[in-house]
Amino acid sequence: MSMFNKVVKEFQWGQHKVRLETGEVARQASGAVIVDVEDTVVLATVVGAKSAKPGQDFFPLTVDYLEKTYSAGKIPGGFFRREGRPSEHETLTSRLIDRPLRPLFPEGFYNEVQVVIHVLSVNPDIPADIPALIGASAALAVSGLPFNGPVGAARVAYIDNAYVLNPTRDQIKASSLDLVVAGTERAVLMVESEADQLPEDVMLGAVVFGHEQMQIAIDAIHELVREGGKPEWDWQPAPKNEALIARVTELAHGDLLAAYQLRDKQARSTKLKEVYAATSAKLEEDALAAGTVAADKATVGNILFDIEAKIVRSQILNGEPRIDGRDTRTVRPIEIRTGVLPRTHGSALFTRGETQALVVATLGTKGDEQIIDALEGEYRERFMLHYNMPPFATGETGRVGSPKRREIGHGRLAKRALVKCLPSADEFGYSIRVVSEITESNGSSSMASVCGGCLALMDAGVPMKAHVAGIAMGLILEGNKFAVLTDILGDEDHLGDMDFKVAGTEHGVTALQMDIKIQGITKEIMQVALAQAKEGRMHILGKMTSAVSGANTQLSEFAPRMITIKINPEKIRDVIGKGGSVIRALTEETGTTIDISDDGVVTIASTSSEGMAEAKKRIENITAEIEVGQVYEGTVLKLLDFGAIVNLLPGKDGLLHISEIVNERVKDINDYLKEGQQVKVKVIQTDEKGRVRLSAKALLNEAAAASQSDTPPQQ
């Protein structure tokens, strides 16, 4: 009898066969599932602490997605030859998995939970993110932890006006949509997508299609749990202290209501801090008088937060003004300024209410492209977008340094929004980096980065296909009543039920990201949200077009200029030289950057037009072919007894035989030539070995013949 209680479930899912198994590997984890999709294999494990740490007032969930290089038959680079810090792709995939799982843990569950997914084998055609999400969901389901899952997931492409389930990498490249959707049997929880200006109904159709198609994976997880699941934890939320809730409400409700009449964020935040401090102080007085221990501040803070949420949500559902005084459809005031930084290639300051982004675009050459060493192979990115949000943006102090997961995620969302509207490399040969510095934040800073990024690119002279704007939507849902909010504030994001970000042009959507905190979002609600988002997007696009009608026709004087020439691919080695000596000297002496592709396309970039012209001339000389009959101005390199070696072009020499210098007999070559002397010669012969024979007397004879023909006949 086997020592393993192994359970396997297999199902056909679109183009792919999927295998789930549990009970053999990682048995000491709370839950472990291996997912195999056509040789892309992941191991998802879950460990949950049996009790919460004392005083814990939030849910400590961590999700780590780790790609092992052995999965693709590779050995890692670097001195230690082992995997190092997570790549950007691993960080983004960890976030992708975290987002639909987090809302499904019950309220009040504060035990630490860690989800770790290892990629063990990779089929280059099958991305590992969807198997990883399915595996994490299945591992949680079999673990017995309190989890209101399982979650299913699907990737959807849109090719030839038809949806494609879980496309291969080649299909994704050919698609006008790359959308990932995750959800439960009844509801969608998360959407992440990049699109090529698709209409809202196509985007919504893709979400619905993906949700329908993921049900087979959810059914398979249910079957796996029935046969291989562990007993459910006997966990119950701590009973609510109704007396404490009533006392806190009595003390703070009126003051919290007054705080939310303040329209300025800083004033409101100050007032809320005062209310929190005063309430805690009063409760400590009560406890001292009664001879008891006061409730801890975390518990009181959670009660106050719940009161805040009820106040804000009821005001909005009752049709009252929002926190800052707007109605549900109004976008905050917008101010736009471009060309704000004098020596950058392109810049824009985009301000929407109390959210502000200073965005800078920089143009570079092919050598500046980012090289990505992915499991499926190395590739290059010509467009980079980086998002930074320092603590001062929210009036706080904090750590400044390498980007956190949130910053990496926001940067990728803004990049997705803009990338489909960039010109192709053939139309605009530069590599492009956009950096969004968030200088103020009160909600929707990633969408401010989209707007500011588009404006900075246009200021830099990048011929965008269209203006791109982004907007963040929110939702308040109570029973059958709901309100969709346009351009949400940070507080509305925290207190609401949905964060729904849409970016696009006047023609359609380029990026859609949705995170839902509750079950029960219907197709109709998403339809309303998309329609209202389009209305807000069009308003912002109008403001952007008024400020900047199109891309600058002139690049910044500080941006590199580029010229392209074509050379014979067999001559590439001549331009590069031994150990790179020739190209290194070229770039240093002309002040240019030179990139050479395998097909012989040479790109020369520099801020100096003179330097570019010189580099172009020298490359043309290096790659030029010596032709018989051509006349060259050469330099005598070396004198021999029987002639002279003359340099015609860089790296190309010829022999001027002693008999070809002048018509009369030459006794001593030193009487006619010196090393370093400039001499005009004609190519009279080349052979199959590349040897070149030159003549100076041929030019003398031609000159004599020409002068004789010009002499008038005698009478």
Curated annotation (Swiss-Prot):
This protein's cofactor list reads: Mg(2+)
Its predominant location is cytoplasm
Pfam families given in the database record: KH_1 (PF00013), PNPase (PF03726), RNase_PH (PF01138), RNase_PH_C (PF03725), S1 (PF00575)
Q: Which GO terms describe its biological process?
A: mRNA catabolic process; RNA processing
Listed under catalytic activity are: RNA(n+1) + phosphate = RNA(n) + a ribonucleoside 5'-diphosphate
Protein EC: 2.7.7.8
Q: Which InterPro entries match?
A: ExoRNase_PH_dom1, ExoRNase_PH_dom2, ExoRNase_PH_dom2_sf, KH_dom, KH_dom_type_1, KH_dom_type_1_sf, NA-bd_OB-fold, PNPase
Give the superkingdom in one word.
Bacteria
The record places domain KH at: 560-619
Tell me its family: Belongs to the polyribonucleotide nucleotidyltransferase family.
Q: What is this protein called?
A: Polyribonucleotide nucleotidyltransferase
The scientific name of the source species is: Burkholderia vietnamiensis (strain G4 / LMG 22486) (Burkholderia cepacia (strain R1808))
Q: Which gene encodes it?
A: pnp
